[in-house]
Amino acid sequence: MLQDILPHVYHSEYRNKTPEDTDIMIFQKGRELLLASDGSYSLPTVGQIRKICPETIKDSFYLFSVDEQGFYSVPDQVLEALPLPLTGPVFGKTTFSWQSVMALRETEHEWHAFGGAVGWHLANWYSLHRFCGKCGTETVHSETERAIVCPNCGHIWYPRISPVVIIAIVDGDRILLTRYNRNGYRRHALVAGFVEIGESFEEAVRREVMEEVGLRVKNIRYIESQPWPFSSSLIAGFSADVDGDPTVHLNTDGGEELAEAVWVDRETLTIEDTSVSLTWDMIRQFKDGVLSPSP
């Protein structure tokens, strides 16, 4: 999956350190990242940016490290000084331009995709907290931890992670596959949704399944989890057996998330996507017989 980057090691702890030329720069704008346009989706280095715009590096701030390679970003206002797209002798034959962060799902360089996605998550969070949500004062970065501090009222913000459940609903040798209605992902998926305030994971599983496909489930079992930076989420994967009638009733209240939900036999199940996501890792487990209904 996306986070499986061995032998590389992700270091999430905050470090107040100076960027080196071999470190990586994360430039984000909304849902876009500055990525190589050659299909590798690589990211520019500190050394490259230092040669064309040294002031940018002076304003950079630390995000995290993969092995000993640091990832850094810059405040939104600093982006205006960059001569975009990034091209020329400093970058060799590579041009860096704005591309969807979701492009990182398609690269074969796992640790680089992970670093870019997590970097986007954190850089986007910093961007959204430039001003205090309590008093409106411009915030500053903590020098001792990964946090945003208001110098006026003293309020402290930490990066947000939204909990999500994803459910492999099983009925004997069948699994329920869904297709989203509007989010741009056209391959099949599993029922999933955000956990509401005051809910347990298990309660969220039951609610999401009932809301989206009108089924009752039992034997809810935890499978595994995955950080999913693209939606600032931590996903908990579960399997569950149908409890009673397996007839699907799609939500049609006008805010429906799913375009379809179909039962697919294990023998005819086709793997449509890579195992970068927990969704397809769980579907593959069902295909291989690892994930089965409770006896």
Locate predicted features.
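Short functional micro-motifs and their immediate structural scaffolds
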Residues: T137-V140, Y158
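N-terminal strand-loop-strand
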Residues: T144-L190, F194, R216-V217, A240-V242
